[in-house]
């Protein structure tokens, strides 16, 4: 194994409620990836995941749950994470895969893809939430991990920024849906647009509001 030491969330990050890893995840030389997802709840687009292995020599100040920091801060942290992490990768499952598998299994698939795409092999993985996909290395779920494990916080930021960019691109094609504002979540604006303009090819047909629109013949 490499000589790299795992990040110490107590000494380097000062988290209010840090996750205390087992001795296994605390071994010298362990390269531990943090994994998180964004986009389980929206009615449109892919679920996007990220995997990040932080470099303990470059602790990144300001890491937090991506939902609790501003877009400007997320963009700044995205650049820093990509510049200083030992490895990072994105994964995804498209809307048609979500329809085929269901959102839970599609999310697990997207997480597997992110871990597999890492440029350096992770010896272990910490995953936000309470479920763990089948992986080639040991893994542990961490409830509210995006606020308790720095590497998961970093993954949440990369996934959020990546998916938001996709929603901005979709908004450029279909501005009448307001994707730049709600990012595909079932807000009143999105529901009204779905009823008025119909479902797009990018909409998740297995999700109730989209299925209802299609049943009424509302297709863009």
UniProtKB/Swiss-Prot annotation:
A divalent metal cation binds at residues 36-37, 128. PROSITE patterns: RNASE_H_2. The gene is rnhB. PANTHER family: RIBONUCLEASE H2 SUBUNIT A (PTHR10954), RIBONUCLEASE HII (PTHR10954:SF18). The lineage of its organism: Bacteria, Pseudomonadati, Pseudomonadota, Gammaproteobacteria, Oceanospirillales. Manganese or magnesium. Binds 1 divalent metal ion per monomer in the absence of substrate. May bind a second metal ion after substrate binding. This is Ribonuclease HII. InterPro entries: RNase_HII (IPR022898), RNase_HII/HIII (IPR001352), RNase_HII/HIII_dom (IPR024567), RNaseH-like_sf (IPR012337), RNaseH_sf (IPR036397). It comes from Alcanivorax borkumensis (strain ATCC 700651 / DSM 11573 / NCIMB 13689 / SK2). GO terms for biological process: DNA replication, removal of RNA primer; mismatch repair.
